[in-house]
Amino acid sequence: MNSRIFHLASALALSSILLVVVGCAGSRRADLHQTLRQNEARTPNGEPEVLAAYQPWFGRPGHINVGYSSQDPAVLARQVAEAKDLGISGFVVNWYGPSHAFEDRAYSLLQDVAAGNDFAVAILYDENSDDPGHTTDDAINDLNYAHDHYIAAGASARAYLRYNGRPVIFIFPKDGHTDWQRVRQAVNTWPDPPLLLYKDVDPRLVGDFDGFYAWVHPGRGGWAADGSNWGQSYLEHFYSEMTSQYPDKLAVGAAWPGFDDRRASWSRNRLMSARCGKTFADSLHLFRRYYNDQRPLPFLLIVTWNDYEEGTAIERGTGKC
């Protein structure tokens, strides 16, 4: 999936995505559809391509039971079909390299399904922070593996997300000690060097990355005990900084339904209220204050499709009071 769908399909995408929010499962998905569609009518030509962050670890010990396995091809086919029905054109998948065999296998199966359904996938590479002395080599080796197995070779490679012909790789930092300049130099030797995108704007990394993406965050006020900080100031700062200071960098906006990690084994008791569906609707619309038909936002990332452990999943709809 690339810029070929940027104007027509992405306009349809945002239009179909603004529908989610009620009480039972069917009406919750209908509201999700409505929310996504209401957004599209405002600027029919420069809509961003809509993606969703995807977690591939369900069915593996250590994660909650959500009723399915991320390695079940039937589940993956259903998820792709449902995402497309909402106007989502691709999944950005948490990936740790081949050392995490369950997630790597799930990603491989998902890319196979995507390739047969005109759907895109991309890697969200989680930086390895377990062994600080080897994070740079790990990143280079893992990304080379991704290139050889998912981006450059095989029948499913056509499903890998591209922008202006180049593969897109998202990087999720974990406070490691990765030398991203070395990583950049390594991937630049590929026949088709990727676009590397880093979470949040970091002026120190402007020379090593092609752009930055937003991620769920409460904003300057931090995590409020009552969940009232829904991320408005964070998104305003991200879009303002990208348009004013880094207009030549690739920007990926974000939207989310809320956040609640109290079910996760690693919980830090962080809460962002769904505000009866307003958090998703407001975060989904906010980019329009900074982007338009003349200066379109390339991508909008929904955080997330199915992270039930952090309370950001839209797969089954978003709740309405």
Locations of the language-model features?
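C-terminal motif of bacterial Sec signal peptides marking the signal peptidase cleavage site
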Residues: V22-G23
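Bacterial N-terminal signal peptides that target proteins for export
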Residues: N2-L12
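Core hydrophobic alpha-helical transmembrane segments of single-pass membrane proteins
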Residues: L12-L19
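Glycan-processing catalytic domains of CAZymes
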Residues: R29-C321
